């Protein structure tokens, strides 16, 4: 395993989530959070889907573009992953989100965070 592979793996997860949020908004919201899929939440989910797609594209391309600076970008992704892990955990603990999806997301996000950190040192 190397840092380039971690970026590519995360890109795939982000792109899948982005496409799900963008094109299957009501399912993504209802299954992913346990909330009622209102038109407002679906619109927000579509916006979030585009953000996830863009982040997925960046994650896919960074190894090719960054060159020798890839470890610095990996550390930034580790920091971002730590923040995402913290907010997902906060939402789970406070009961703001429900279902299996948040647990899967927090585990995946934490694993990517650790991988980015350890392979970027």
Model-found features: residue ranges?
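Non-cytosolic membrane-interface motifs at loop->transmembrane helix junctions
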Residues: 33-42, 72, 96-107
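Membrane-helix boundary elements
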Residues: 3-6, 17-42
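Core segments of alpha-helical transmembrane spans in multipass integral membrane proteins
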Residues: 15-20, 40-63, 76-83
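Membrane-helix boundary connector in multi-pass membrane proteins
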Residues: 64, 86-103, 119-121
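Juxtamembrane helix-break-helix junctions at the cytosolic face
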Residues: 58-71, 92-93
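N-terminal membrane topogenic signal
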Residues: 1-11, 119-120
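Hydrophobic alpha-helical membrane segments
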Residues: 73-88, 107-112
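Membrane-water interface at the C-terminal end of transmembrane alpha helices
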Residues: 110-121
